[in-house]
């Protein structure tokens, strides 16, 4: 890479972003997205003719402003969407919903539970023993998260207009172990393949292992080596065929969405619908799979948002 050329392009993007921010232009968000993409991939983001999956997800973030995406990025309202598809049985049971952390009566909660903010990702309090929980610290975290606007730094627009809430869910036994996340790449009801993440229980976050399986559960070699430490062959999930049907049904209304599920024994549980995996840039994939997923996703017929 020509580092001088790289820094020159970054300099002009910074100037453009500063100008657009001064005139409060929506375009500032996407100038920043171009800069972030360039820093991550060393390539210019092709909005005019997007080809690979990262380019197409970034294009969809800019131009596809379907309000259903905001509804389904909301960890509270997405439950209604899942239920509307006849899949209420895969939802983790709720124990409450609150507008403020001060509204939560911890004495009434079970010994094990999960509290999470609905308008972002990673804002969770996982309690496995209420007697050991620092309640005031938990309240402070939740209240802080409620006041934050998720996705601004990564231009994930689907999160911007979600009314912040705290939701409580039952603690599921599989959350305490080495859970495997099954994440299905989908488009308009079609399922392409399954991205998996496991070994999340390790202390070192760099030891989390990513892998990729085709729709027939054959492991592929499409993940870059550094993202798959301690790689091992995973058995086909017990309810895999049902998971494919669920992913198909939940993706019917979207040009691209990643449907995240869990399989615990004979039960399938809903995780979330993800419209911008890894903030839109799936750099752990080798280029051939990025291109293949890009061909899988069609942008035809999408009315481009203009502002």
Segments and roles (model prediction):
Residues 1-64:
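Membrane-proximal basic amphipathic "stem/tether" segments
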Residues 30, 263-307:
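C-terminal active-site "lid" helix and adjoining low-complexity regulatory extension at the edge
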Residues 49-131, 141-157:
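A conserved helix-loop-beta module that forms one wall/lid of the active-site cleft
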Residues 113, 192, 257, 269-271:
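Protein kinase-like catalytic core scaffold
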Residues 126-127, 203-212, 280-284:
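A short, polar/proline- and glycine-enriched secondary-structure boundary/capping micro-motif
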Residues 129-130, 186-190, 264-266:
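Short acidic-glycine loop/turn motifs at beta-strand connectors
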Residues 136-226:
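Phosphate-binding site of ATP-dependent enzymes
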Residues 160-165, 208-268:
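A long amphipathic alpha-helix within ATP-dependent nucleotide-binding catalytic cores
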């Amino acid at each position: 890479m020509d580092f001088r050329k790289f820094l020159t392009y970054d300099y002009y993007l910074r100037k453009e972003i500063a100008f657009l921010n001064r005139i409060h232009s929506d375009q500032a968000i996407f100038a920043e997205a171009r800069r972030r993409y360039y820093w991550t991939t060393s390539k210019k983001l092709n909005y005019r003719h997007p080809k690979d999956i990262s380019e197409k997800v970034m294009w969809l973030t800019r131009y596809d402003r379907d309000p259903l995406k905001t509804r389904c990025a909301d960890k509270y309202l997405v439950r209604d969407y899942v239920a509307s598809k006849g899949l209420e049985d895969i939802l983790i049971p709720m124990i409450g919903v609150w507008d403020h952390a001060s509204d939560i009566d911890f004495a009434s909660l079970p010994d094990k539970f999960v509290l999470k903010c609905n308008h972002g990702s990673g804002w969770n309090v996982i309690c496995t023993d209420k007697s050991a929980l620092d309640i005031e610290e938990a309240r402070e975290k939740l209240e802080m998260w409620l006041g934050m606007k998720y996705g601004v730094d990564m231009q994930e627009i689907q999160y911007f207009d979600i009314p912040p809430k705290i939701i409580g869910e039952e603690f599921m036994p599989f959350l305490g172990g080495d859970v495997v996340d099954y994440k299905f790449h989908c488009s308009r009801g079609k399922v392409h393949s399954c991205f998996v993440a496991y070994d999340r229980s390790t202390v070192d976050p760099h030891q989390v292992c990513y892998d990729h399986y085709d729709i027939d559960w054959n492991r592929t070699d499409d993940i870059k080596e550094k993202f798959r430490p301690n790689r091992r062959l995973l058995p086909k999930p017990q309810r895999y065929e049902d998971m494919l049907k669920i992913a198909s049904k939940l993706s019917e209304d979207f040009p691209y969405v990643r449907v995240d599920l869990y399989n615990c024994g004979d039960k399938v549980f809903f995780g979330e619908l993800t419209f911008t995996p890894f903030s839109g840039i799936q750099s752990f994939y080798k280029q051939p799979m990025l291109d293949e997923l890009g061909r899988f996703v069609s942008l035809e017929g999408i009315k481009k948002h203009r502002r």
